[in-house]
Amino acid sequence: MEELEMKVFEAFAKDWALVTAGSMDRFNTMTIGWGAMGTLWGKSAVTVYVKPVRYTHEYLDANEYFTVCFFPKDYKKDLSLLGSRSGRDGDKVAETALTPVAVEGSVGFAQASLTLLCKKIYRQDMDTAAMPEDVVKRNYEVEAPHTMYIGEVVKVL
């Protein structure tokens, strides 16, 4: 596995990323601001969090692979759009300057400065009973909690 040099605490929260699952003929992507990178079971891993109401959730559940793509700051407007519209309502990617590309069993984007191809190795719905009360009030009083997806990083592009 290649070494990555990045500010991991800013990569998700400040710079954002796209998580994408599916194939070139049928995929969905969404902007994520929560995530983690590290190791699990001796493997390089990425964790992403997606609410069950999001269209991308269906694709993550149905597919073995997903990508996490990071972009130069010039694409922040595109990531904002992809995080505010649903793929259920049409081709939101067509409204951006991003070009989808096939990535060995999933989909990435030509403009990404970093693409992590991940094989899904764990999926778990988060349990509000195990969370601090203030976190539940702030994030989960209206909608169900996120699903956590952990992917083994099988390729860095």
Language-model features: locations:
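Basic, polyanion-binding surface patches
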Residues: M1-L157
